[in-house]
Design a protein with these regions (language model features):
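Active-site-proximal, substrate-binding regions of enzyme catalytic domains
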Residues: 1-216, 226
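Long, internal scaffold/assembly segments composed of regular secondary structure
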Residues: 222-224
Length: 226
């Protein structure tokens, strides 16, 4: 089960401070209880990579990854069950080991190809989005052909583009898409690219079930991703 940055941040904050907002605490409790009871491993790798690549720091990634491991070492299942059912809204504050994870071969300071492709795609999407002379169908076709000619076809990017260009409810362009500042536009695309790359990374695993002897799931608190 892959988790996104929002969930990882909430989990670590909950354990560090001993409390968070009640509804969020219950969500964390349900996730931890359900995964443990079902024997499902939780992976924070993508969430750790998001923050570490922004900081260009492998050391911070290994430290955060160890904090994530510490959570599983120090809290019992029964406690998470009580949190999930609302019988417990505060937990003992964790004592993180202060160590860094070892035996890790992944370079978390590198955002990866999926992220970089998403940034490039979203920049082109914003260029099309700002073109008021083109019809929605033209924009969708142009975006598809651009992906085909330059990168890889991504179902998630295509669905997002189609929903954006046809003004579907609650679907928003990347932040600062209408800004006159190129720096702001790039920043907005970089932020949105992480959402897309979570899905595309996940899709490379679940789309070929015959290659793996396990199922891959993804959990998020992000409304757009849902």
């Amino acid at each position: 089960l892959f988790i996104d940055r929002n969930i990882l941040s909430s989990l670590l904050q909950f354990c560090k401070e001993g409390h968070i907002q009640s509804a969020e605490a219950k969500r964390i409790g349900v996730l931890m209880t359900w995964s443990r009871l079902c024997g499902i491993d939780i992976s924070a790798g993508l969430a750790v990579r998001e923050r570490a690549s922004q900081r260009h720091s492998q050391s911070s990634a290994l430290l955060e990854l160890q904090k994530f491991f510490d959570v599983f070492d120090q809290y019992p299942l029964q406690m998470w069950f009580q949190v999930a059912t609302g019988r417990l809204n505060k937990i003992p504050q964790i004592t993180f080991s202060g160590k860094v994870a070892y035996g890790i071969s992944v370079d978390y300071s590198d955002p990866g190809d999926h992220y970089e492709m998403a940034v490039a795609s979203l920049l082109h999407l914003v260029w099309l989005y700002r073109n008021n002379d083109a019809a929605p169908l033209e924009k969708i076709r142009d975006f598809y052909l651009w992906l085909y000619d330059n990168l890889l076809i991504s179902e998630y990017l295509l669905v997002y583009a189609a929903m954006l260009f046809t003004n579907q409810s609650k679907i928003k362009a990347p932040k600062h898409a209408n800004s006159n500042s190129l720096k702001a536009i790039i920043s907005g695309c970089e932020n949105q690219a992480w959402d897309i790359s979570y899905l595309t990374n996940w899709s490379t695993l679940y789309s070929e079930p015959e290659r793996y002897d396990k199922e891959f799931l993804f959990a998020t608190n992000d409304n757009l991703l849902k």
